[in-house]
């Protein structure tokens, strides 16, 4: 006979008592352990209590397995105080579920938001701003102050919010193709709702504009920033969708990454330092160098997305001419850019530190050749193409890290 068909009598708060008449042999504990309802957290003692006084023994013999707390008239717990002992562990766990759920949801949303802002470009923008401002500060160390650093930090926040705004629009309107090309993005992976994405995008645009006004950046910088907010929207938002056309996509990258951001940051940096804007040779070099890279990156960015672009009908250069052709052409122009940088250092030693520029760009060029060879060896698979494109971003970041130290 199973123990679960017995009546139980709770005489003490820490024990369950079961009548000995219910056990078929003296080896009661062995039978008890064999039962699927054995409870390890409370010791069980046997007593001489007879169940016939409270329920029929005939029913006990024929009752099917119901469990210690099943809905049966003979299985209700009974205590001296006529009150069942509350399960304090269960109650505590229910009380602790609420804060635990809040923490988990907050952590998941934070992780999805970090993926939403695209970490690699986010870090790249931070380095670009720091490098351009740092180059001006190194030339004028006497102007350093903590208030200056605080104002510069607020300017960095403006640029980062602009970056979130641009990337947010791009992900919202590219959701269908991202499910194929970039399934790890939070919207494509359904880790974040479209409503939350819109909130982050609009908040970033409004907050950055308000911060610009608070910093009193002047009419020229504020109007220029508003223009880039509009141009950034036209890149992704229908019916414009400049990114769908190779020419308009390249033009946007050239104006935004190559000229716009660099000019905006340098102008703001010198204004913060109380200096007039000036076209110095190092700044002219970085504008020309990065503008060329921005054109190359706008072409090569579609190499990892060939399959998805074909399915959604996007006519990108890798789709038309093939990934291998575009990669070889893009890498070739990248190498020419490095050759030009070495030539500039040789021709204008009075403006540039050749002992830094020449070996650094030679190393960058060698690394690019090796990475292109690895991509060709991998037959331009998506994973290898992603790695190659990210490596190009690292090369551009390395150029900005080098920038404050190339000027004589």
UniProtKB/Swiss-Prot annotation:
The keyword Transmembrane helix applies. The keyword Chloroplast applies. It comes from the Eukaryota. Changing residue 178 to A: Loss of catalytic activity. Expressed in trichomes. InterPro entries: UbiA_prenyltransferase (IPR000537), UbiA_sf (IPR044878). Keywords: Chloroplast, Membrane, Plastid, Transferase, Transit peptide, Transmembrane, Transmembrane helix. It is an enzyme of class 2 (transferase). One of its GO terms (cellular component) is chloroplast membrane. Pfam families: UbiA (PF01040). GO terms for molecular function: transferase activity, transferring alkyl or aryl (other than methyl) groups. It catalyses: a 2-acyl-4-prenylphloroglucinol + dimethylallyl diphosphate = a 2-acyl-4,6-diprenylphloroglucinol + diphosphate; a 2-acyl-4,6-diprenylphloroglucinol + dimethylallyl diphosphate = a 2-acyl-4,6,6-triprenylphloroglucinol + diphosphate. Pathway: Secondary metabolite biosynthesis. It is found in: Plastid; Plastid, Chloroplast membrane. Its EC number is 2.5.1.137. Residues 1-46 form a transit peptide. Its main location: plastid. The chain crosses the membrane at residues 119-139, 146-166, 193-213, 217-237, 257-277, 281-301, 326-346, 355-375, 388-408. Its cofactor is Mg(2+). It is a multi-pass membrane protein. Involved in the biosynthesis of prenylated phenolics natural products which contribute to the bitter taste of beer and display broad biological activities. Catalyzes the two last prenylation steps in the beta-bitter acid pathway. Uses dimethylallyl diphosphate (DMAPP) as the prenyl donor. Homo- and heteromer. Interacts with PT1L, forming a functional metabolon. Belongs to the UbiA prenyltransferase family. This is 2-acyl-4-prenylphloroglucinol 6-prenyltransferase, chloroplastic. It comes from Humulus lupulus.
């Amino acid at each position: 006979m199973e123990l679960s068909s017995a009546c139980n009598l709770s005489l003490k708060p820490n024990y369950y008592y079961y009548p000995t008449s219910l056990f078929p042999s003296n080896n009661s504990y062995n039978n008890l352990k064999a039962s699927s309802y054995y409870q390890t957290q409370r010791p069980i003692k046997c007593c001489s209590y007879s169940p016939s006084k409270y329920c029929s023994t005939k029913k006990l013999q024929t009752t099917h397995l119901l469990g210690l707390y099943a809905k049966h008239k003979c299985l209700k717990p009974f205590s001296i105080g006529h009150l069942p002992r509350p399960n304090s562990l269960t109650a505590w766990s229910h009380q602790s579920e609420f804060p635990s759920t809040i923490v988990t949801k907050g952590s998941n949303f934070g992780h999805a938001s970090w993926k939403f802002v695209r970490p690699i470009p986010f870090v790249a923008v931070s380095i670009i701003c720091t490098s351009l401002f740092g180059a001006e500060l190194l030339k004028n160390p006497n102007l350093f102050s903590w208030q200056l650093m605080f104002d510069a930090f607020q300017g960095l926040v403006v640029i980062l919010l602009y970056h979130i705004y641009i990337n947010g629009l791009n992900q919202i309107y590219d959701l269908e193709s991202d499910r194929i090309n970039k399934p790890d993005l939070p919207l494509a992976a359904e880790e974040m709702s479209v409503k939350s994405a819109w909130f982050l995008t609009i908040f970033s645009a409004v907050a950055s504009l308000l911060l610009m006004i608070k910093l009193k950046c002047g009419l020229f910088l504020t109007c220029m920033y508003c223009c880039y907010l509009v141009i950034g929207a036209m890149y992704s938002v229908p019916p414009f969708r400049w990114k769908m056309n190779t020419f308009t996509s390249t033009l946007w990258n050239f104006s935004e990454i190559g000229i716009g951001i660099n000019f905006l940051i340098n102008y703001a940096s010198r204004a913060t330092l109380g200096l007039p804007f000036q076209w110095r040779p190092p700044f002219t070099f970085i504008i020309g160098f990065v503008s060329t890279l921005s054109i190359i990156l706008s072409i090569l960015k579609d190499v990892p997305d060939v399959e998805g672009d074909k399915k959604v009908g996007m006519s990108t250069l890798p789709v038309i001419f093939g990934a291998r052709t575009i990669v070889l052409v893009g890498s070739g122009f990248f190498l020419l850019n490095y050759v030009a940088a070495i030539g500039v250092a040789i021709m204008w030693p009075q403006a540039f530190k050749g002992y830094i520029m020449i070996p650094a760009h030679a190393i960058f060029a060698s690394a690019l050749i090796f990475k292109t060879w690895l991509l060709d060896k991998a037959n331009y698979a998506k994973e290898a193409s992603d790695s190659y494109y990210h490596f190009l971003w690292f090369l551009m970041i390395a150029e900005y890290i080098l920038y404050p130290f190339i000027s004589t």
